[in-house]
Amino acid sequence: MAEKTYVMTLAEKKQLEAELEEYKLVRRPEVVERIKIARSYGDLSENSEYEAAKDEQAFIEGQIQILETKIRYAEIVDSDAVANDEVAIGKTVVVQEVGTSDKDTYHIVGAAGADIFSGKISNESPIAQALIGKKVGDKVAIESPAGSYSVEILSVEKTS
């Protein structure tokens, strides 16, 4: 069975690599040291410091595994290969809801880089899927849990 690929920009991959390095070179050694100190307290059956450190170690190892998988199966997209006014991964798009003055700005990224609080939406999200491939001036129907609405694409720029 083929592994899932993780679509992302080169910048997103580099960010994941930096995060992986942080886990391997900083967080993993810190938790190993905390486990060592907690063991020195003696009886492990009622040692909450030891249990907490072991739980954190399991979390860290899980994160390392997830990051390694995303990096290994990364599919890098080049937003420069797409027309300047076309919505794609690695682009920032400004849209205005038709019939209102409401404007929204979205940075379209691969799923691994999504962060809705900073306006970074996954290419797999309904909004991004509706916008990808469209150009400035296009009107696009967006399906959301709250209902359907239309937006006009006002601008598209490469995300820095």
Curated annotation (Swiss-Prot):
Keyword match Metal-binding: no
Residues annotated as transmembrane: none
InterPro entries linked to this entry: GreA/GreB_C_sf, TF_GreA/GreB_CS, Tscrpt_elong_fac_GreA, Tscrpt_elong_fac_GreA/B, Tscrpt_elong_fac_GreA/B_C, Tscrpt_elong_fac_GreA/B_fam, Tscrpt_elong_fac_GreA/B_N, Tscrpt_elong_fac_GreA/B_N_sf
Keywords: Coiled coil, DNA-binding, Transcription, Transcription regulation
GO BP, one annotated term: DNA-templated transcription elongation
GO MF annotation terms: DNA binding; RNA polymerase binding
Ribosomal protein in keyword set: no
Coiled coil: 1-72
Assigned protein family: Belongs to the GreA/GreB family.
Biological function: Necessary for efficient RNA polymerase transcription elongation past template-encoded arresting sites. The arresting sites in DNA have the property of trapping a certain fraction of elongating RNA polymerases that pass through, resulting in locked ternary complexes. Cleavage of the nascent transcript by cleavage factors such as GreA or GreB allows the resumption of elongation from the new 3'terminus. GreA releases sequences of 2 to 3 nucleotides.
Listed NCBIfam families: greA, PRK00226.1-1, PRK00226.1-4
Name of the molecule in the record: Transcription elongation factor GreA
Organism: Streptococcus thermophilus (strain ATCC BAA-250 / LMG 18311)
